[in-house]
């Protein structure tokens, strides 16, 4: 991952978002870069109570792409039947930045979705189904 990315100290994270940040950072190709667990009286940079997000960068590699595919399947296909959790790309205007520097990924929750439930789900499906891209490549040989 890029040198400028460092994991946020646990004491700086909103309590209800820590487990989701931790499970995302447990993937080798992911580095979280922002989060908010929602607040009863939010400041301008915070989200309202009952909503939350985690934003992250993904390594530009086969492993990174494989991890994105896994999360897209797990979150968008297997997890949220009510469509209140969204996994999607986000970007600043690319013409204002260097190439390959604006794309990030975000998971957003609405309608009082519990980020800890998503974290538990991701821990389970990662344990049960996730294989590294490298291990899958060697299977076909």
What is the predicted role of each segment?
Residues 1-141:
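Structured alpha/beta or helical-core interaction and ligand-binding surfaces enriched in interleaved
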